[in-house]
């Protein structure tokens, strides 16, 4: 065992549709939106790191009538003392986000479904590819 996810939870959640106009614009133009993801971490104790995965679903063009959807999903991991920094970086930026993304996806999809949007599904994310792109 190099690391173990000991806890995961929703730290913050925002699903705001300002009104009927926003609702119908979103329904009509849902394909004209993008998903942004930001992963940050901080060491809490020896061998324990909190990893925050922030997901934003937003329109490509900003407008005062636009909705705001974001989820901050936190994971606590316990890792071995002898782990190298490079390996720990990959755990934080690739492995943990990959492991928790199905939960985030399910939560966001359920919010959309319960808000009247049928068959909404977030795209798959390749955190390995995102990591490699950011490194170059």
Language model: regions and residue ranges:
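N-terminal intrinsically disordered, cationic/polar leader segments
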Residues: 1-136
């Amino acid at each position: 065992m190099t690391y173990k996810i000991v806890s995961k939870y929703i730290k913050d959640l925002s699903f705001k549709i300002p009104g009927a106009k926003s609702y119908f614009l979103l329904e009509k133009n849902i394909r004209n939106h993008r998903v942004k993801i930001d992963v940050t971490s901080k060491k809490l104790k020896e061998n324990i790191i909190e990893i925050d995965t922030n997901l934003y679903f937003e329109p490509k063009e900003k407008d005062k009538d636009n909705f705001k959807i974001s989820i901050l999903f936190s994971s606590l991991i316990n890792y071995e003392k002898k782990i190298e920094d490079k390996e720990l970086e990959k755990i934080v930026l690739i492995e943990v986000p990959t492991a928790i993304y199905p939960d985030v996806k399910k939560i966001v999809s359920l919010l959309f479904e319960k808000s009247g949007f049928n068959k909404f599904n977030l795209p798959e994310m390749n955190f390995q590819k995102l990591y490699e792109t950011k490194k170059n």
